[in-house]
Amino acid sequence: IDWLKLGKMVMDVL
């Protein structure tokens, strides 16, 4: 799991 990409996706959603 790419946590950096996951975190970026979360930030984009918020």
Curated annotation (Swiss-Prot):
Domain of life: Eukaryota
Residues with PTM Leucine amide: L14
Subcellular location: Secreted; Target cell membrane
Pfam (any one): Mastoparan_2
Listed GO biological process terms: chemotaxis; killing of cells of another organism; venom-mediated mast cell degranulation in another organism
Keyword terms, alphabetized: Amidation, Chemotaxis, Cytolysis, G-protein coupled receptor, G-protein coupled receptor impairing toxin, Mast cell degranulation, Membrane, Receptor, Secreted, Target cell membrane, Target membrane, Toxin, Transducer
One GO molecular-function entry: toxin activity
Keyword Acyltransferase: no
Record carries keyword Zinc: no
GO CC terms: extracellular region; membrane; other organism cell membrane
Family designation: Belongs to the MCD family. Mastoparan subfamily.
Name of the protein this chain belongs to: Polybia-mastoparan-III
Species for this entry: Polybia paulista (Neotropical social wasp)
